[in-house]
Every structure is written in structure tokens, then in C-alpha cells.
């Protein structure tokens, strides 16, 4: 939550005015400039919802001075949030899941890599059950550490520049790589485009913008 000059002066470049919503646009999920004090309950409810849902991230609420001084006669916290332009996806695509299972059945050297997204969706138990059922070795990014117990016989350690030889070698040797809740960032994979040549890459992430961003994906 940030402070702003009086609403009537926004955009006139007065003393201490800053276009904070514009400046923060590249690193927040959403920005609000509060125009009326009566909108504060709705905006705060929406801001918390956007920040915590889907892929979590910061939401900026900019409050002009006159709005800060105004009185909200009846503060009513909205029961529901209805945002037409923000609909995070949680359910998997059945057709794509079938492709994943078909690729897994044909694979001889599969590997499952878990990222921080598995923790955020509290999916560690599902990952563990899936790996055990199909006997798939598991590695993790730094943010994914803990999705599998470190002493589990299927766990091969952390991937990346700060990871172990076994985990990094497992990706090189695999013919099927399942990335769950990981961004494929440079700290985990230095050259993903080259690394995944000749492999089937499955990328699972709640944020569609991350899928295929850093490497060509076979099954999104």
C-alpha cells in the first residue's frame, strides 16, 4: 500500500508525486489507484485474492491523500470476488494428461523435477504418490526442496548450478522430463533449449506464461 498526492493533482507532476503504479507494473501482478474511499473494501478484498491465488505475487494499492482522509461510512467486506479479467486455472487439461501418461508408458528413463509451485499448491503428497506408483526418480529445484524426503530412495537431489552431480546427470540421461511447478530458470538449467533436444519435455505450471518460456515444450 502506497501513498499518493491528492486525486485532483495526479498526473500534474506536483511535489512528491510519483507514478508508482506505472513504475511497479513490471513486477506486480496488478495495481490499483483508489479513486473513492468507498471502493477500499472491494479493492482490498480483490488485492488479497489476486496476490494469494494462482501464482502468488504482489499487488500494489496506491491511495491518494484525499482518499486517505475521507470517511468510509459503512465498511462492508465483500463476501465474493468477481473479476472478469482474472481467472486463474487450477484444473488440468484431460487431453494433455492423457498425452503425459502415454509418454510415460513409452519412456525408458523418465525423471520428475519439482519446483516451488508444488509447495505453493500443497502438492507434495500427490507428487510422492505419483512417483512411487510409477517408480519415477525425482529431483528438485532449490525452491522445490522438501517435496520429496531427502532420504527417499527415489529422490536424487537438487538440480542446477548449486545442485548435485546425480540430479544434473539424471536430466541429461532422461528421455522424458516432467517439470512440475518449476520455471526452468537459468540457475536450474543453464541451456535448456540444447539440453532438451531429443527428449520429451512435459511442463506443468499454474502460470501459463511460464510454460514454454525458457525451453520448447513437448506437452504443455
Regions found by a protein language model. Give the residues of each.
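N-terminal alpha/beta PP-like core and its mobile active-site loop of ThDP/TPP-dependent enzymes
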Residues: 1-220
Amino acid at each position: 500500500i502506497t501513498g499518493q498526492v491528492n486525486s485532483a493533482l495526479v498526473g500534474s507532476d506536483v511535489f512528491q508525486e510519483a507514478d508508482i503504479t506505472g513504475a511497479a507494473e513490471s513486477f506486480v501482478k496488478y495495481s490499483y489507484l483508489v479513486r473513492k474511499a468507498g471502493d477500499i473494501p472491494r479493492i482490498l478484498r480483490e488485492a488479497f485474492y489476486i496476490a494469494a491465488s494462482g501464482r502468488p505475487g504482489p499487488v500494489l494499492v496506491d491511495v491518494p491523500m484525499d482518499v486517505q482522509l475521507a470517511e468510509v461510512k459503512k465498511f462492508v467486506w465483500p463476501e465474493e470476488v468477481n473479476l472478469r479479467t482474472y481467472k486463474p486455472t487450477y484444473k488440468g487439461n484431460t487431453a494433455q494428461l492423457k498425452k503425459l501418461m502415454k509418454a510415460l508408458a513409452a519412456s525408458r528413463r523418465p525423471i520428475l523435477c519439482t519446483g516451488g509451485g508444488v509447495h505453493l499448491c500443497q502438492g507434495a503428497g500427490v507428487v510422492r504418490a505419483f512417483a512411487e506408483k510409477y517408480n519415477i526418480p525425482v529431483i528438485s529445484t532449490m525452491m522445490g526442496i522438501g517435496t520429496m524426503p531427502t532420504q527417499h530412495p527415489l529422490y536424487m537431489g537438487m538440480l542446477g548450478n548449486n545442485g548435485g552431480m546425480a540430479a544434473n546427470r539424471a536430466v541429461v540421461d532422461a528421455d522424458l522430463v516432467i517439470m512440475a511447478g518449476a520455471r526452468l530458470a537459468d540457475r536450474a538449467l543453464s541451456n535448456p533449449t540444447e539440453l532438451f533436444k531429443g527428449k520429451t519435455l512435459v511442463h506443468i505450471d499454474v502460470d501459463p506464461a511460464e510454460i514454454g518460456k525458457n525451453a520448447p515444450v513437448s506437452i504443455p
